């Protein structure tokens, strides 16, 4: 039989292991990289934050990278980027759904490592100094919007078609019911 002392040590180790697992393995974090692909001597200033975390300002020299760990279960992260003379060009965007972001002269590019075998296959997302609603949206974002609109319109069409068919079926059955009632009435005379 296990002594009480050994049992308490075993329970303590088990509880400690569960606590460590809940802080590491069970809370999934993914990496977000922001890279400066601007021309020579054109630094990039990055300020990433969320409602609970402020990652302070970082200055990236050309070809430099900034790494951010984002917890999937936590709040929404977004980043401000500034570049150009006196850092007058600016853009802000959400980074929760992206693995690699590149700042280039014409705007911000995006790529997901798990889908892009070649890291040079980035998609243009946002232009500098352009509001997000006016900026060229990513093909991924437009696909999601168009697919959701298509899906919702198909669902609405399906319900409309079912409603029309049920109404036609009801009218057809109602006509048959009238004919049966008239036939019974005439037969009973």
Curated annotation (Swiss-Prot):
Pfam families: Self-incomp_S1. GO terms for biological process: rejection of self pollen. Coiled coil: none annotated. Residues 1-25 form the signal peptide. The keyword Signal applies. One of its GO terms (cellular component) is extracellular region. It is found in: Secreted. Belongs to the plant self-incompatibility (S1) protein family. This is S-protein homolog 26. The lineage of its organism: Eukaryota, Viridiplantae, Streptophyta, Embryophyta, Tracheophyta.
